[in-house]
């Protein structure tokens, strides 16, 4: 059976993929600056004699052509960029700079290279083509740039996986509908009237107004939104003042809105703006409200969900495949591709409680159980095989 062959190849290449992951992990590069990562990817593809082209600067798009060409093509994607976080893990392959793969993109690149090794080995049995997209700048919405370079031309379906620390390594999760939230960001500038800290009565204190705005924002989700609809409004930055005895002129709050559709995000943004303007007016302050559109929600295609479930069960067993009813409220620019083609976004378990590998994404102690690398490589390979056979 093909799944037996896939798992056997993944096991054989396991140490090779771990080595690649550790090399990438120790040299994390920020969005659109993934030069060393891109070079490593190309070197590994060259070893396999897999054709590829450059996309979006540091990105790479490889193609594996099956012998039995049905005319169908599935694209598998991994993101490449790191975050500006100082790593606190004590690992032999710890980051050597001030950046960190705290979102697991080092693992994503590694397991997609593992997938390339597997599929290249069995390409005589592929009933179509597989494209492998190593995408730069996910943290900065890199898919917007990539998609303009026609990477989806000739592609019929898409799939990807993301490190998920709350799921144990060796298991995966598949969302039944929405996998990742739609997003936006906002910035509130409260304009008061500065003065001496001893004379607040002669000032319009923007810090006091900012506190009132912050408190009012906490009422949006609990009092303005249907409790069965997932919505998050978070203020993540609150800045004002530079001196101990001067009431400043302005206060700036920054944050994000998350919901299961961009329409809901826009609705919540309007509620937020009305609250901000009303509170500021009540305190005699002026304000500026600025928002920037974020990504759309990641919505899994129904047919791809079922295909992914069946493929995962072949590789992992039914007991290690979790169907998830509620979305994660994080965002992902894979949504851009899924607006164009049917796709599947999977949560790849990377946690291991016994090894204390349970820190969340974007944490300076985030790590993975490297067992997940062969799991993901096998799963993505099986998914590609099954898609090309079925459709």
Where are these regions (language model features)?
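Acidic/His- and Gly-rich active-site-bordering loop/insert found
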Residues: 2-101, 106, 110-126
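Short acidic loop-to-helix transition motifs that present clustered carboxylates
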Residues: 55-61, 139, 328-331
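Histidine/acidic-residue-rich, glycine-tolerant segments that coordinate divalent metal ions
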Residues: 83-85, 90-100, 107, 122-248, ...
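Metal-dependent amide/peptide-bond hydrolase catalytic core
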Residues: 211-391
């Amino acid at each position: 059976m093909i799944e037996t062959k896939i798992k056997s190849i993944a096991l054989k290449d396991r140490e090779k993929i771990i080595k690649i992951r550790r090399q990438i992990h120790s040299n994390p590069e920020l969005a659109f600056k993934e030069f060393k990562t891109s070079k490593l990817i190309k070197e590994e593809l060259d070893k396999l004699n897999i054709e590829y082209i450059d996309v979006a600067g540091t990105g790479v798009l490889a193609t594996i052509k099956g012998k039995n060409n049905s005319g169908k093509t599935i694209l598998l994607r991994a993101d490449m960029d790191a975050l500006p976080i100082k790593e606190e893990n004590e690992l032999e392959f710890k980051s050597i700079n001030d950046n960190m793969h705290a979102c697991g993109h080092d693992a994503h690149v590694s397991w997609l290279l593992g997938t390339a090794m597997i599929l290249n080995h069995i390409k005589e049995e592929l009933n179509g083509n597989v494209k492998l997209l190593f995408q730069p700048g996910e943290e900065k919405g890199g898919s917007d740039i990539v998609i303009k370079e026609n990477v989806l031309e000739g592609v019929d379906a898409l799939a990807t996986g993301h490190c998920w620390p709350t799921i144990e390594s060796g298991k995966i999760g598949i969302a039944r509908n929405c996998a990742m939230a739609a997003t936006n960001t906002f910035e509130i500038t409260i304009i008061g009237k500065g003065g001496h800290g001893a004379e607040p009565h002669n000032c319009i204190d923007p810090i006091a107004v900012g506190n009132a705005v912050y408190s009012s924002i906490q009422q949006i989700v609990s009092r303005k939104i249907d409790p069965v609809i997932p919505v998050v409004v978070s203020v993540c930055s609150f800045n004002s003042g530079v001196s101990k005895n001067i009431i400043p002129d302005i206060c700036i709050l920054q944050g994000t809105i998350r919901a299961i559709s961009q329409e809901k995000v826009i609705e919540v943004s309007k509620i937020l703006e009305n609250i901000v303007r009303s509170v500021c007016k009540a305190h005699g302050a002026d304000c500026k409200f600025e928002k920037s559109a974020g990504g759309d929600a990641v919505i899994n295609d129904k047919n791809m969900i079922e295909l992914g479930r069946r493929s995962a069960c072949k590789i992992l067993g039914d007991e290690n495949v979790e169907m998830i009813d509620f979305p994660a409220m994080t965002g992902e620019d894979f949504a851009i591709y899924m607006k164009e083609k049917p796709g599947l976004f999977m949560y790849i378990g990377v946690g291991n409680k016994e090894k204390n590998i349970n820190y969340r994404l974007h944490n300076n102690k985030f790590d993975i159980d490297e067992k997940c690398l062969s799991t993901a490589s096998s799963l993505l390979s099986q998914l590609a095989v099954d898609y090309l056979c079925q459709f």
